[in-house]
From Swiss-Prot:
GO terms for cellular component: host cell endoplasmic reticulum membrane; membrane; virion membrane. InterPro entries: Prot_L2. The chain crosses the membrane at residues 39-59, 67-87. The gene is OPG096. It comes from Variola virus (isolate Human/India/Ind3/1967) (VARV). Early protein involved in virion morphogenesis. Participates in the formation and elongation of crescent-shaped membrane precursors of immature virions in cytoplasmic factories. This is Protein OPG096. The keyword Transferase does not apply. Keywords: Early protein, Host cytoplasm, Host endoplasmic reticulum, Host membrane, Membrane, Transmembrane, Transmembrane helix, Virion. Induction: Expressed in the early phase of the viral replicative cycle.
C-alpha cells in the first residue's frame, strides 16, 4: 500500500511541475502578442487544452469499453428499426 501512496505522490508532484511549465509557456505566448489579443490567445489555449483532454478520455473510454459500446449501439439501432418499421 505504501508503494501506491508513494507513486501517487510522485504523480502529483509531476503534475504540479507540468502545470507550472505550461503556465510559463502560456505566459510567454501571451506577452508576445498585443494586449488586445491576450484574452483571445488565453481563450484559444484553454479551448485547445480542453479538447486535448476530452480526446484523451474518449480514446481511453472507447478502447477499454468497446464491447459494451458496440452492444449499446446494436440496441439503439434495433430499437430504432423496431420503432420505424413495426410501429
Amino acid at each position: 500500500m505504501e508503494v501506491i501512496a508513494d507513486r501517487l505522490d510522485d504523480i502529483v508532484k509531476q503534475n504540479i511541475a507540468d502545470e507550472k511549465f505550461v503556465d510559463f509557456v502560456i505566459h510567454g505566448l501571451e506577452h508576445q502578442c498585443p494586449a488586445i489579443l491576450r484574452p483571445l490567445i488565453r481563450l484559444f489555449i484553454d479551448i485547445l487544452l480542453f479538447v486535448i483532454v476530452i480526446y484523451i478520455f474518449t480514446v481511453r473510454l472507447v478502447s477499454r469499453n468497446y464491447q459494451m459500446l458496440l452492444a449499446l449501439l446494436a440496441l439503439v439501432i434495433s430499437l430504432t428499426i423496431f420503432y420505424y418499421f413495426i410501429l
